[in-house]
């Protein structure tokens, strides 16, 4: 119940739903109250914020500092384990396997497989539990997609119980102890994930995937015209900012827990 409540409240505070709530409140004031000026202010703030957060220069300027914490892993250090954190998914056996990994999940898996190929004999670990309306776990879907891309099942470990990053860290500790491993997740999520894993006394090596903030050349109109693509980048900023606030409120500093 607490997990569901956390997800609902957290998602309502993300840019799109929050701005729609503000605009909706403004419309309600305009139509059903005498506070016309306040209603106009609410609508104007919501509209302007949505406009700005849907522009590439604004969205990526906000996202880039989070994503640039760790560089892409190109180190020669060899590891025995590569941990790929779960993300959005569904399971429809009629689809191409990779279509079942939604948004951030497929780039994470692709990077995990790249690193697995660079570390012969290593194990790929997929994490993530079962969604409320699904019978297949995030970890299992990741394993099935990896198999479809040529990774032998015996080289894969699935951790099917964790519901969030904190639980994923605890599950990885139980599975591999303090062995060094590559931690693969979205670049925006990696700073927060590293704190949870280090707090467990683990030895994660950061391997970011799914970088979104663009600083390479784009067409001028792509920078100037609002797009849901850029709004999604702003959404990542909101999501990770809320996650870090929650982490701070829980007292997760990144220092190992005292046994």
Curated annotation (Swiss-Prot):
Principal place of residence: membrane
Q: Where is the signal peptide?
A: none
Keyword terms, alphabetized: Cell inner membrane, Cell membrane, Cell wall biogenesis/degradation, Membrane, Transmembrane, Transmembrane helix
Q: Cellular component GO terms, alphabetically? A: plasma membrane
> Topology with regard to the membrane?
Multi-pass membrane protein
Q: What happens when the gene is disrupted?
A: Deletion causes a severe growth defect at low temperature and an elevated frequency of cell lysis resulting from impaired metabolism of the essential lipid precursor required for peptidoglycan synthesis.
| Subcellular locations according to the entry | Cell inner membrane
Entry keyword Cell inner membrane: yes
Q: Which GO terms describe its biological process?
A: cell wall organization; Gram-negative-bacterium-type cell wall biogenesis; peptidoglycan metabolic process; protein folding
Segments spanning the bilayer are 12-32, 39-59
Q: Which organism is it from?
A: Escherichia coli (strain K12)
The function of this protein is: Plays a critical role in the metabolism of the essential lipid carrier used for cell wall synthesis.
Identification of the protein by name: Envelope biogenesis factor ElyC
Pfam families annotated for this entry?
Answer: DUF218 (PF02698)
């Amino acid at each position: 119940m607490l997990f569901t409540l956390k997800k609902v409240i957290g998602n309502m505070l993300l840019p799109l739903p929050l701005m729609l709530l503000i605009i909706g409140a403004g419309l309600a004031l305009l139509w059903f109250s005498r506070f016309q000026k306040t209603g106009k202010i609410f609508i104007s703030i919501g509209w302007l914020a949505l406009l700005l957060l849907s522009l590439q220069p604004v969205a990526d300027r906000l996202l880039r500092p989070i994503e640039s914490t760790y560089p892409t892993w190109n180190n020669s250090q060899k590891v025995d384990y590569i941990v790929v954190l779960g993300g959005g998914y569904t399971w429809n056996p009629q689809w191409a396997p990779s279509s079942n990994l939604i948004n951030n999940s497929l780039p994470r898996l692709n990077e995990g497989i790249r690193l697995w190929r660079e570390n012969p004999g290593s194990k790929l670990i997929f994490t993530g539990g079962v969604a409320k309306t699904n019978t297949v776990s995030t970890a299992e879907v990741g394993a099935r997609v990896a198999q479809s891309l040529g990774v032998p099942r015996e080289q894969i470990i699935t951790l099917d119980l964790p519901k969030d990053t904190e639980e994923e860290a605890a599950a990885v500790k139980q599975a591999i102890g303090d062995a060094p491993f590559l931690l693969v997740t979205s670049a925006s999520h990696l700073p927060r994930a590293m704190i949870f894993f280090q707090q467990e006394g683990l030895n994660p090596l950061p391997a970011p995937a799914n970088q979104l903030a663009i600083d390479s050349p784009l067409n001028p109109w792509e920078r100037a015209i609002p797009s849901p693509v850029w709004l999604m980048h702003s959404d990542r900023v909101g999501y990770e900012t809320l996650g870090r606030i929650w982490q701070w409120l829980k007292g997760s500093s990144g220092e190992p827990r005292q046994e």
